[in-house]
Each structure stands twice: as C-alpha cells, then as structure tokens.
C-alpha cells in the first residue's frame, strides 16, 4: 500500500493509571475489569480539565495539521473522551447526539493506526443512510489528505459494477450501508473483509430502527474476530445493547449527554398554535419574515414534502425537496444546492433530521410535528450548531396538542408561543390559495410518475437498496 505514508507513532495517550487525572476518572472502569467481564463505563465529567488540542489526546502532528485545516480548533467532549481510549486499542460505545463531532472521534484513531500498519480494507464504517455514508467518506478523505487515504462509498442506488471496480482498487476505508455491502460480500468475486482491522457502526440506533439487524448479523459473521469495534449511537436501547454484546469485546462506554432531550442554549424554541386548514398560509407568512435566511421545513410524509415544495416555488421561494424516494443523485443535488445557498429552503422528511453535513441553518420549521420527542430534538438540532444561534418554530394545530405536551414534558419546560398578528397572516390567504391549486396540479403529475414507476418495478418486500434509504 504505497499511497499511505508509513511512520512509527508513539501514542501519547496515557494508559490507565499513568497519571492522577486519568486514574481518578477511570477508577471504576478498572474495578469493573477486575470483578466481572462487564462493559466499562467512562462518563464524561465536567471536573476533568478539557484538553486544549488534539495533540493533547495523542494525535500525531500530521493529523493535527489536518484538523486545523478543517477548522477543528479544539476537541469536542466526545472526541476528548473517545480518542485516548481508542488509541489504547479498546472497543468503544459512544453515546452522543448528531453534531457532536463523533465522526472525527473514530476517524482520527483509525487513520493514526492505518499510518502505523498500512493495508487495504483496513476500516469499515456502516451507516444507516446514503447521505451519511458520503459525508463520513468526505471526512475521512479530508482528515487523511496528507497520507493519501483511499475511500470507497458502497451504497444502494448506485451502479454495482462501478462499485466492484472501486473495491478492486483495494481502498483503505469502506463506508457503506448494510444492504449494498452485503450484496457485494455475496456477489462480488474476490471481495472479502477477512483482514479488516476496524469496524464502526455509526448511528447504531437508526441502523436497528430501520430493520438492518438481520443484515448486520450476516455481515458480522464474515468479519474477523480480531478487530477493534466502535459503536456510536444517540441512545442506548435494548436493541443497541444486544448489538454491542454480539459485536464488541469488553468495551468502554463514553457518554457526553446527560439528558437525551437536551437542546443547546443558543436555540430559541417556540410554537405557533393555528388552525390546521391555515398551515400553508402561516408557513408562507413566516418565510417572508425570515426572508434571506436558510430554513429547513420538516414534514411527516413524502407527499407533503413535494406538495409544499411545489407550493413555495409557485410563490417565488427557492425551495427544494429532500426525501427517501428521490434518486440518490437528486438527493445529493438537493443537499449541494442547499449547502451552497443557491436554494435557501429545504423541505424535508426526517431523512434530514440526523447525520447530514449541513453547516449553517438559521431556522427550523416543524410544519408537521414529529411523533416522538427524540425526533424533535434531532430536527431542531439542525440549527444553532457550533455555538451559533438559531430559531425553531413548531406548528401546533388542534390535532397536535397531545403530541406537543409530550414533547414539552420530555424537554422539561414550557416553550413560548410565537407572537404574530392573525390579520396580517390572513392577508396572504388568496395568494396562497392560488398557489395551492397550482400545487395540486403538479402533485397529480408527480403521483402519476410515482405510480408508473411502482408498477414497473412491482410491489412487495423492500429490497436492500430500499432499506439503504431513510423511511419517508
């Protein structure tokens, strides 16, 4: 593997008991190792001094320079807790929300180990959605730019032959969705992961929520037992616990979130109580109030995502849809346009709630409330990131009161009602009504195209490619 520049690395991360601070923070871990073969737990605490740089964590200068180039000024809590333990060769369970910097938390130790012993098929990262897989690959390539790391993205919706060619070039890192990876393991001649050194399951709770469990079992059976495994998840459900027992060896658990429903202090959250029949009018009014700012509008269904996109476009807004039934190229194109601000409004199902690399969103509008509090937190977490301020407004109709009260209960606080003048809103009624009629015509054409496609490919059990995309 001549492309990776090999050099001898002395890990600077302290071993257990090598200094006073490390010993005190991990004392219970050592005790658990002595008494039973249970998983260790290393909870992040505010009492330990935060490392000032990635070098403090044991990351070599070459990778530290890459961090600086990417704008990583100081380690995030999940990076500060995970990286030293990963450099010690431990299996890890990382409990952290999206936007916490967890990709670098597993990418940096893997890249550092790759520099010590370069080989093909060194690391495998499994992700629940295609977009997240491309994002992770981009992070690996950026962090590993100085060592010429080669990555292959293996996801559904893309050409199998070109992916087989990419695998034939023996990349260092594979980032994949489970369905398409299993297709290649079963059907691509000469492709094997018998020499794999690192496995990462990112957003494991979503992998299991999307029924990837049986596919993960098949993948795990063909991987070598002698490997390092990192499992990252926003929550620790019973399914995730079962997965970690089946795939990890005496892992350390790192948790950086004391409250799974916690939102950042720079996020201004409110709700808008309104009649269901007037939701479109209120939406247009709010977008006029936030004109010039980037916004994500969350809906519950593909149909509503498309309808609102058509509605807003007819009114002159730069809106673009994002949902799981778009082609892969269309989804990546939508994200690219939104990131570049050539379109400033993204209308999306919950495919955009977690894991996507959208660095700057000013406003989140929950046009349709999510059915659970966890999804609400992930949605509003798309704004007010990296210390910036943000606004999240949720539409609460007469049919949503019970759901909204559950969300407020999970947050542990009552949110303020967004104040506006109803008379000013209803001035837009006639204009929005015309746009609604136009959107109905466009939706009819859209649904006819979808129906033709469904008949062409037939109905029945979801294919692995369909499982490789977010529901909705």
Curated annotation (Swiss-Prot):
Example GO BP: rRNA processing
Region listing for Disordered, in residue ranges: 1-51, 451-472
CDD domains: DEADc_DDX47, SF2_C_DEAD
Residues that hold ATP according to the record: 96-103
Record field: compositional bias (Basic and acidic residues): 10-19
Segments carrying motif Q motif: 52-80
InterPro entries assigned to the protein according to its UniProt record, in alphabetical order: DDX47/Rrp3_DEADc, DEAD/DEAH_box_helicase_dom, DEAD_box_RNA_helicase, Helicase_ATP-bd, Helicase_C-like, P-loop_NTPase, RNA-helicase_DEAD-box_CS, RNA_helicase_DEAD_Q_motif
Top-rank taxon: Eukaryota
Reaction equation(s) it catalyzes: ATP + H2O = ADP + phosphate + H(+)
EC number: 3.6.4.13
Basic residues: bias regions: 452-462
Motif position, DEAD box: 202-205
Domain Helicase C-terminal stretches: 282-426
Signal peptide as annotated in the record: none
Polar residues bias locations: 20-29
Main location: nucleus
One CC-aspect GO term: nucleus
Domain topic, free-text comment: The Q motif is unique to and characteristic of the DEAD box family of RNA helicases and controls ATP binding and hydrolysis.
Function: ATP-dependent rRNA helicase required for pre-ribosomal RNA processing. Involved in the maturation of the 35S-pre-rRNA and to its cleavage to mature 18S rRNA.
Quaternary structure and partners: Interacts with the SSU processome.
Family: Belongs to the DEAD box helicase family. DDX47/RRP3 subfamily.
Protein name in the entry: ATP-dependent rRNA helicase rrp3
């Amino acid at each position: 593997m001549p492309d990776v520049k090999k050099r001898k690395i002395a890990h600077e991360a302290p071993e257990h008991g090598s200094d006073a601070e490390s010993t005190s923070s991990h004392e219970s871990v050592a005790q658990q190792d002595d008494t039973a073969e249970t998983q260790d737990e290393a909870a992040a605490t505010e009492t330990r001094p935060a490392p000032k740089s990635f070098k403090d964590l044991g990351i070599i200068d070459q990778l530290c320079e890459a961090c600086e180039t990417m704008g990583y000024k100081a380690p995030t809590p999940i990076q500060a807790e995970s990286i030293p333990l990963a450099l010690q060769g431990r299996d890890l369970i990382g409990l952290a929300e999206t936007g916490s910097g967890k990709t670098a938390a597993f990418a940096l130790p893997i890249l550092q180990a790759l520099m010590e012993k370069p080989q093909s098929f060194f690391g495998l990262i499994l992700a629940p959605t295609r977009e997240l897989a491309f994002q992770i690959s981009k992070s690996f390539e950026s962090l590993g730019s100085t060592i010429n790391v080669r990555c292959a993205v293996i996801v559904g919706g893309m050409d199998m032959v070109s992916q087989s060619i990419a695998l034939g070039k023996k990349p260092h890192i594979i980032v994949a969705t489970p369905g398409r990876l299993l297709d290649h393991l079963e059907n691509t001649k000469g492709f094997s992961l018998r020499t794999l050194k690192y496995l990462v399951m990112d957003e494991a709770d979503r992998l299991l929520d999307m029924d990837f469990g049986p596919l993960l079992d098949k993948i795990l059976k063909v991987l070598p037992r002698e490997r390092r495994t990192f499992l990252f998840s926003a929550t620790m459900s019973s399914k995730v616990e079962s997965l970690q027992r089946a795939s990890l060896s005496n892992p350390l658990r790192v948790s950086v979130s004391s409250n799974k429903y916690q939102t950042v202090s720079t996020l201004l959250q409110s709700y808008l109580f309104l009649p269901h029949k007037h939701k479109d009018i209120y939406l247009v009014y709010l977008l006029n109030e936030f004109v010039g700012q980037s916004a994500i509008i969350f809906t519950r269904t593909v149909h509503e995502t498309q309808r609102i996109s058509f509605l807003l476009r007819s009114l002159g807004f730069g809106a673009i849809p994002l949902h799981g039934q778009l082609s892969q190229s269309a989804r990546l194109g939508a994200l690219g346009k939104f990131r570049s601000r050539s379109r400033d409004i993204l209308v999306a199902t919950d495919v955009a709630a977690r894991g996507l690399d959208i660095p700057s969103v000013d406003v989140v509008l929950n046009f349709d409330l999510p059915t659970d509090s966890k999804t609400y937190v992930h949605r509003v977490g798309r704004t007010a990131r990296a210390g910036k301020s943000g606004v999240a407004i949720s539409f609460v109709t007469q049919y949503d009161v019970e759901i909204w009260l559950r969300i407020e209960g999970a947050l542990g606080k009552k949110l303020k009602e967004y104040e506006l003048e109803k008379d000013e809103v209803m001035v837009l009624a006639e204009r929005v009504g015309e746009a609604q009629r136009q959107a109905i015509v466009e939706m009819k054409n859209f649904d006819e195209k979808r129906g033709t496609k469904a008949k062409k490919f037939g109905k029945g059990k979801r294919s692995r490619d369909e499982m490789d995309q977010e529901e909705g």
